[in-house]
Regions:
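Detector for intrinsically disordered, low-structure N-terminal pre-sequences
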Residues: 9-12, 76, 291
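Feature activates predominantly on carbohydrate-active enzymes
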Residues: 97-323, 330
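Short acidic, S/G/P-rich loop/turn micro-motifs used as interaction or catalytic elements
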Residues: 62-66, 167, 386-387
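Catalytic-core regions of glycoside hydrolase
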Residues: 286, 296-387
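Acidic, contiguous N-terminal accessory segments
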Residues: 22-120, 124-149, 331-336, 346, ...
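Bacterial Sec-dependent N-terminal signal peptides
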Residues: 1-31
Length: 387
């Protein structure tokens, strides 16, 4: 009886040690492989892929899909017709759990399997495989047995690039797109200003501006890597790049300042729409047209209208134009809030809740008086450099 009891104790302790060993091994593996951005689900298994990383050379698709653009250690992978000779099997096979850009990646002892909902998901599946291969190679490890399911938590994942102050060589932007693609960024808002050779308004372009065709090629390159570039052309304010030119001075809100357009001058819109059309030609694959609109207050050359009224006149005209071009307009929303005396609480994190509430109680009617005039087809975006 005593011997049986001792055996049971040893068996229990042995099972506990084995379980802890498995947990420690999984934790160690997770520390060894850093996926950026992190994936939704990952499950490390016991064991490793049995072949050397350098021998991962061939891929087979039972659905006859093409390989996506490849990076790093996956660049040399070729597609073949014989599944027995392929280390990777991949397919675009929509499944119930898949959404746009989602994929699954499974590394077994003798096969790597990637499935996706669409070409973007396939692209991201191979990017994740490359990260695992590079981490393993850099640490002289074998590829882990692992099962990954990944989908985006945020559908549109853009960054903003501002080229108005300085334009790099074209090669820089191609290289940057490659870097962003590997981080699964899928959008760029490009603040272009005078760095585009406008055909309709050539005086606006700077001497180092790129032609529409050159930006279009960059946009095409980005799209092939699942990145859509949308232009940002400053509208009501930040307009010095347009209004500094002699022929455009009559469009100034203040004749002595090149900062802002007069929103009551019809020719303001003729010029702005020309700039938008050229920008859309240069970036034909984007869904959006960012029209700017921040940090500006106008008088309409002493019209008697309030700055908020004038802002809304301009905003409605340009958002309507953007929609007619099948673009979703994006607008910086700081000025309507500022003009309604509601901007302060947004950037002052030292205010108490009661202070914020009191400001909104007092000033919300300033905004509500015009609320029906705000366009409904517009993305209202807020910049914040104080976070």
């Amino acid at each position: 009886m005593l011997l049986q009891f001792r055996f049971s104790i040893v068996l229990i302790i042995g099972c506990q040690l084995f379980f802890l060993s498995c947990l420690n091994n999984q934790s160690k593996q997770e520390d060894q492989y850093i996926l950026i951005p992190s994936v939704l689900e990952k499950d490390f298994k016991e064991g490793h892929y049995k072949k050397e990383i350098k021998k991962i050379k061939y891929a087979y698709s039972p659905t006859n899909d093409s390989l996506p653009i490849l990076y790093g250690l996956t660049q040399h992978i070729e597609i073949i017709d014989n599944p027995k000779d392929a280390q990777i099997e991949f397919a675009i096979e929509p499944e119930e759990k898949f959404i746009e850009e989602s994929y699954s990646l499974q590394i077994n002892e003798d096969k790597i399997i990637i499935k996706s909902n669409d070409s973007a998901g396939l692209f991201y599946g191979f990017l994740t495989l490359n990260q695992l291969m590079e981490d393993a190679s850099n640490q002289n490890l074998q590829l882990p047995k692992i099962k990954i399911y990944d989908k985006p938590k945020i559908a549109f994942r853009p960054i903003q690039i501002d080229v108005k102050h300085h334009l790099e060589k074209k090669s820089y932007y191609y290289n940057l797109i490659d870097e962003l693609a590997q981080l699964k960024i899928n959008g760029i808002i490009l603040e272009i200003e005078d760095k585009l050779k406008y055909k309709r308004r050539p005086e606006v372009a700077s001497s180092d501006a790129l032609a529409i065709e050159e930006w279009r090629e960059i946009s095409k390159y980005a799209l092939a890597r699942n990145i859509e570039i949308s232009p940002l052309v400053q509208g009501l304010g930040h307009a010095s790049f347009v209004l500094k030119h002699k022929k455009n001075k009559p469009l100034r809100d203040d004749p002595n300042s090149d900062w802002a357009f007069n929103p009551l001058n019809p020719k303001t819109y003729e010029l702005q729409f020309d700039l938008y059309l050229d920008a859309i030609e240069a970036f034909p694959h984007g869904k959006y047209l960012h029209i700017g609109g921040d940090e500006v207050q106008t008088s309409g050359r002493g019209s008697g209208k309030s700055p908020l009224e004038l802002n809304l006149i301009w905003l409605n005209k340009v958002t309507s134009f953007a929609s007619k071009q099948n673009r979703i307009p994006i607008f910086w929303d700081d000025m309507p809030l500022k003009q309604a005396n509601l901007m302060g609480p947004i950037y002052n994190n030292k205010m108490s809740k009661s202070e914020v509430d009191s400001i909104w109680m007092a000033n919300e009617p300033n905004l509500n008086r015009f609320i029906e005039q705000f366009p409904k087809n517009c993305v209202y975006m807020r910049w914040n450099y104080h976070m």
